[in-house]
Amino acid sequence: RLQRIILLLVLAFYSLVLCAQFVDYERITPHPRLLLTQGGEEAVKKSIATFPSLLKVHKRILEESDEILIQQMAERVMEGKRLLSVSRLALKRIFYLSYAYRMTKEEKYAYRATQEMLSVSRFPDWNPSHFLDVGEMVLALSIGYDWLYEYLESEIRSIVRDAIVEKGLDAAAPDEWFYRAASNWNSVCNGGLLYGALAVFEDVPDKAKKIIERCLLTNPKALSAYGPDGGYPEGFHYWGYGTSFQVLLIAALESALGTDAGLSEYPGFLKSARFMEFMTAPSGEYFNFSDAVNGVRCNMMMFWFAKKMGDLSLLWLENQYLENPSVSFAEDRLLPCLLIFCAHQDLSNIQPPSCHFWHNGGKTPVFIYRGGWNSKEDSYLAVKGGSPLTSHAHMDAGSFIYEREGIRWAIDLGMQNYLSLESRGINLWDQSQEGQRWGVFRLGNMAHNTLTINNKRHLVNSYASINRIYKSEDKKGVEVDLTSVFADDMEKVVRIIYLNEEDDLIVKDELVTGEKEALVTWIMVTPAEARIVGRNQIELAKDGHRMLLTVTAPGDVEMKLWSNEPTHVFDEPNPGSMRVGFETYLPANRRNFCLLYTSDAADE
């Protein structure tokens, strides 16, 4: 233990030395210094005049800003243990209004932004017990304070500055747990605090430097999650959240201090943009593993990555979304960032990516094959490994998403709203083997496209690795080692899942039993209608397409159709979906193979 403490102290000292080398506080830019520095408006105006899709985004921000003018001020209303929705509302309003003022110079926007800042500054606190709420609120006030600095009267500046310091910077103890976290909490909380420190730097330089240096010391923990090759352990949904704030953090360092102190160079971070691109299937839906919702949304942070890496192919999908008049945006409260990041980028000749395979290791290994980038009918296979102990994870090792000819045949039900569970007393964050989290239908293994042995939960203290990748024309897929997931009941479990030359799905499970026989339950969640049509066969039908599932196994197989009706009063309904699959008993002390393959159903 003493050696560990000494090592940490040495690392801390070394990091502070590096920080001193990287950061020259004498170079801090004048206000406005966060994201869009003085005169940066002209580049934004040029880009929105050049590209109609960006002009639509600009007009959207102005229209929503006009709507904000007649709405009531944000109030301190808690939702369970969170103030987060209020922080996000304040952030959206202040960011939009400040942008509108800088682009139009119409004082109505600056005045209302000022009133919003004064309103939340008067809150007794910003709910530091759930520090994400503080992180987003500090970000909101820091942008308003910085962007409207010349507009604000000195008395108002003082009120807002004091709120940033007392309810933001001072609320973060040096030993806050999020400083040690490798999750989105690190990026969000560090990001908000960094903005606060940079915004009020002149008035509290010593305090601001401590916040900045603590950020540079602890933020690499969050960046380590992207290694080694860009996969994000928490899935696309929290990539959108955590990475948005990570980008904001880096961009603020660059705009205010002229350096990101090497943060963007951490292994895997920049590569994660390609991970995110592959998370979107040809249908426009996502590979929504872990706590994630589905849908089609433009992610504005991709424009930062494209600019940083000089790779416009990262915008192939995002640019298409922008052309949609009804486009929605991930983390839309940050929408002005899109126009800031698009400045000095030529969006007129974006080409599709040239790659069709993605694979990452790390905490949550993922494999994806995408048949193309130009058609909704391109095939798509996405498979994951990992552990239930990862932040926001489900019991879904070995699960997959499968699309073909425009149909998503195998789906993930996604997350359930946190408040709907917490308000009923469910301890959603207990990830122990008997934790209540796994009693939620959508989060357990029985609601995912994977195996269940003897009707038991997956072992939480397990890790499913991807051991082999197949990239040939007739075998595009992966081998996942599930042995540790079922270590209490099986000697070995390996899943090989791939698409053949016709892009039919083949799932081959190798299962080696121990001293006792084992009941194997094979499940696939689908939005299709299903019927058992014969021995070892199920037919799926959706949108005029039909697909046949055929099973071979060493013993008798019982084909199964399961309803996705809620099993507990706290479970949300799952309309338009069901589960299909089979059950079979495997004898003791034997190596067994269960094979499921798809094919086009014959016409009746």
PLM features: what roles do these ranges have?
Residues 600-604:
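A short, hydrophobic C-terminal helix/tail in secreted or cell-surface proteins
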Residues 1-6:
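Bacterial N-terminal signal peptides that target proteins for export
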Residues 21, 320-328, 420-599:
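CBM-like, beta-strand-rich accessory domains located in the C-terminal region of large
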Residues 33, 39-41, 47-48, 54-62, ...:
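Aromatic-lined, polymer-binding surfaces characteristic
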Residues 22-28, 32, 43, 371-434, ...:
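Terminal accessory carbohydrate-recognition/targeting modules of carbohydrate-active enzymes
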Residues 200, 241-409, 470-475, 479-481, ...:
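Carbohydrate-active enzyme catalytic cores, enriched for enzymes
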